[in-house]
């Protein structure tokens, strides 16, 4: 996967409408093979029913692009309370009185119609008075929000008990790395001690937690050019008795992986995925190395291979950058800052390229395994 580059041109109403349409087309393609029963089913307390995700996508769009920007009333009164991700834990969302089936699809369409009507009358120029609209920020935010939920939906689709293979899952996004007789031995990249610029520039869309761009002093470090592969993780399991990644099962002397209702042999040349931070940290210690900090990862990112196979756990807690300012709302970043969440960097095969920028900070609880997460090794400079 190509990492997104810095945006240097301002969006237009036409380009924004096209981005919204592209994101929605991709969302609908993901659920296209599914019937309403599968959309409404709760598969795990860790993930919402797909119907909730779809309604949340539409309701979030209505909140920001119709109500906040357009000043229009909601279509369904207090429906938004059921799609509040903070107030409604994932384990409870299947019991909420949310929209389903034809009513849900109609709501998504009606919200989009109102969104496009409001878009025609707003100022999205670089000099727009409202920072929410300046350079189309709020529209870029809504596109990113939908794209990120697509990855969450793909996490649930891994749990399907019927065969399903969306077009996105067929795309090969990771180039196998060479493996010698002793196991995977990726080259290490060396970075000297010094000052490195971290964070997103002022121009172009980025989330509040990616800013402000600032200088960070780093000690010298080494980081592997490629992520840890399944072959290397198999060796680790064999020597330590560690649990296999989520969805793996023993098949004689080998391993299979069952996801999206399809069972296939584990490809040893692919990056290991579906492991928790605790498992990644334990592997790194077994290998005599450590997880990189998120700043080390970002400094090295232009030189890393294999980004886009799996999110990569870092050793860093999710904290605000110096000079951080919440925008446009606290619930995206602020409520998660602290030592409870670990930062992941990079992207997975399920991540859209618009999200996969080198400054993007993903985060999750260290025990989570259903996310598309693996690791890359680092160590102090020798």
Predicted segments, located by residue:
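Extracytoplasmic and endomembrane cell-envelope/extracellular-matrix remodeling and assembly machinery
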Residues: 176-191, 195-197
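Short acidic N-proximal helix/loop "leader" segments that mark the beginning
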Residues: 193-213, 240, 247, 251-259
